[in-house]
Amino acid sequence: MNIILLGPPGAGKGTQSQRLVERHGMRQLSTGDMLRAAVKAQTPVGLKAKAVMDRGELVSDDIVSELIDAELTAMHGNVGAIFDGYPRTAAQAGQLDVILAKHDRSLDKVIELEVNEEALVDRITGRFTCAKCGTGYHDRHKQPAREGVCDVCGSTEFKRRPDDNEETVRTRMQEYRAKTAPILPIYEERGLVERVDGMGGIDEVTAAIDALLK
């Protein structure tokens, strides 16, 4: 099973990708993570990418495709792939088809986690964590049992991510729509796109995705 998992920041894509890895033995292929790892390991494609980035240029589709190709080559044929952050353009979608065919694979599903923008703004802007143990809380949905005291470790220090503000969240939503707009119609024409309500509980979303993969 090879899938593309789509969803804006805050939709729970990272959490669900990890669930797929744990429950189905799949491999998450995040182009950003792979690029950083290749540069750090000084692989041939990593050195090529570093030279481009050192010039202040964007890494080309060809280099990203090389990364994907190398990862699939290293993977066992029975291990499914979760593509995260790729493809983002029609050209990349075409390249992915070629790469998958080379490895006797095909794309089975494109799953989009749908979110309500207003609810997503509320979810993200209200979240905060214990500065000591990292336990997550929310202004409206999950306050500590004792005000100002972490339920887990008893710390009284909390923190918020500086980019968890309404303006940034809405900008991210716009960027996400712009990035996915070119590729969704391609996969919709093939009948591969499935949509899951990303605003449900984590277990509910996981169950909905599992049902699509059966």
UniProtKB/Swiss-Prot annotation:
Cell compartment(s), UniProt: Cytoplasm
Residue stretches in coiled coil: none
Gene Ontology process terms (BP): AMP salvage
Database matches in CDD domains: ADK (cd01428)
Molecular functions per Gene Ontology: adenylate kinase activity; ATP binding; zinc ion binding
Keywords from the UniProt entry: ATP-binding, Cytoplasm, Kinase, Metal-binding, Nucleotide biosynthesis, Nucleotide-binding, Transferase, Zinc
Family statement: Belongs to the adenylate kinase family.
Stated name of the protein: Adenylate kinase
Gene: adk
